[in-house]
Design a protein with these regions (language model features):
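Extended, charged amphipathic alpha-helical segments
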Residues: 192-324, 363-368
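Extended, regular secondary-structure scaffolds
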Residues: 115-120, 124-211
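Hydrophobic alpha-helix feature that most strongly marks membrane-spanning transmembrane helices
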Residues: 297-301, 345-356
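Extended, helix-rich architectural segments
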Residues: 1-133
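Glycine-rich and small/hydrophobic secondary-structure elements
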Residues: 323-335
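Short amphipathic alpha-helical segments
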Residues: 98-110, 284-288, 292, 332-339, ...
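Active-site lining segments that contact anionic ligands and/or coordinate catalytic metals
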Residues: 270, 342-349, 360-364
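Extended amphipathic alpha-helical segments with heptad-repeat/coiled-coil character used for oligomerization
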Residues: 338, 353-370
Length: 370
């Protein structure tokens, strides 16, 4: 399925490719990428305050801090069980111990990749040679390049950082094609090429990035997390002002009044002072929070079990004890088996180039948890 970050070229030639990748990066600031960035903020629970603060005035936020909850990673882990336990990897019918020794934290990174791919709808997984073994990076923002009429990308580009002048730096990889070697190069946001090796040749001949695509993202989970953060902040405000809003009548507008338990309030004749209560109840507000979470869970074949031990108006009533997966994840297995095979072939070639050792054919994987 094509996305806004897929580039289709009418034909393949080095000049067309180089011109396209320089122009393509200018379109990366798309709505799809903004939503993906928000999803990852909530998954890693970083910068989440900014996504809640925009819904409140500055004066309101001087009363209480925003109150986001760390529910997105729990949803992602409950919904994606394939890598809960390490899968069994085999080469030529035997345990792939040599391959395991040549990879660094593969199971950990694979589980993170599994969860973030489901959450965002699409992620890239880069294999790279590190300290005498293959190491891995997750790539959330990238461009894939296709020749018109072909379903497999011939290249990929993604940002890798900034230079000392704060220019964005990108990397481009392409596979060997029609007898020509693949390309590996860097370039900046102005399109200037930065050489990485002699002739900018891809030493592997393949793209060292593999991908998983879902038909949709879990955007409803992210929106539920935002709604819950807003609602919890509203609850904190309601608790802060549980005595009600102070209201005075019969007092000149310029009169300054200071409230406090250690202060005596002197009112002029005919003036009144009172607190007007909040018409809402904390219990009702907490049920709304639960409703947001429960609906997102149902949409994703999950069920939430809440702590019912405390009194309903207490914070204990909002403690999420467990998220149960109500549906077997067997349907996800073919997708992830395909990815395991694609990634293994990439790892195999990287290991062969750097060590002259072939890990072997007939790779197989068995997922212990579905």
């Amino acid at each position: 399925m094509m996305s806004v970050n897929d580039v289709v070229l009418p034909s393949y030639s080095e000049d067309i490719v180089l011109d396209s990748i320089r122009r393509a990066q200018k379109g990366l600031e798309e709505k799809e990428n903004a939503e993906r960035a928000t999803a990852l903020d909530f998954y890693y629970h970083k910068n989440v305050d900014t996504h809640i603060e925009q819904w409140f005035s500055t004066s309101t936020l001087q009363q209480v801090p925003v109150f986001p909850q760390k529910i997105v990673p729990r949803f992602a882990r409950a919904r994606n069980m394939i890598y809960k336990n390490s899968p069994k990897r085999m080469i030529n019918g035997e345990q792939a111990d040599d391959y395991k020794d040549m990879t660094h934290h593969l199971d950990t990174r694979a589980r993170e990749f599994n969860e973030t791919s489901w959450l965002t709808g699409q992620m890239g997984f880069r294999s790279r040679w590190g300290k005498e073994r293959v190491e891995y990076d997750l790539i959330p923002f990238f461009k894939k390049y296709y020749v018109q009429g072909e379903s497999e990308p011939f290249g990929v580009s993604y940002e890798v950082g900034r230079d000392h002048k704060n220019n964005r730096i990108y990397v481009f990889w392409s596979r060997a094609r029609d007898g020509a070697p693949g390309i590996h190069m860097k370039f900046d946001q102005a399109g200037r090429t930065i050489q990485v090796n002699d002739d900018n040749v891809n030493p592997y001949g393949i793209i060292p990035v593999t991908f998983v695509d879902y038909t949709t993202s879990a955007s409803d989970v992210i929106r539920a997390a935002i709604q819950i953060g807003i609602a919890n902040t509203e609850i904190a405000l309601a608790e802060r002002f549980s005595f009600g809003q102070p209201v005075a009548t019969g007092i000149e507008e310029a009169t300054k009044m200071k409230l406090g338990i250690d202060r005596v309030l002197l009112l002029p004749e005919g003036a009144t002072f009172s607190f007007v209560g909040n018409p809402g109840s904390l219990k009702d507000m907490m049920e709304v929070v639960k409703g947001f979470a429960n609906q997102a869970a149902v949409n994703n074949h999950l069920r939430i079990r809440w702590d019912e031990s405390g009194n309903p108006p207490s914070g204990t009533a909002l403690r999420l004890l467990e998220i149960e997966n109500l549906e077997s994840r067997i349907s996800d297995i073919p997708k992830w088996k395909d990815w395991e095979h694609e990634r293994y072939e990439v790892d195999r070639e990287i290991i062969r180039v750097h060590t002259n050792k072939d890990m072997g054919e007939n790779y197989a994987v068995d997922f212990a948890e579905v």
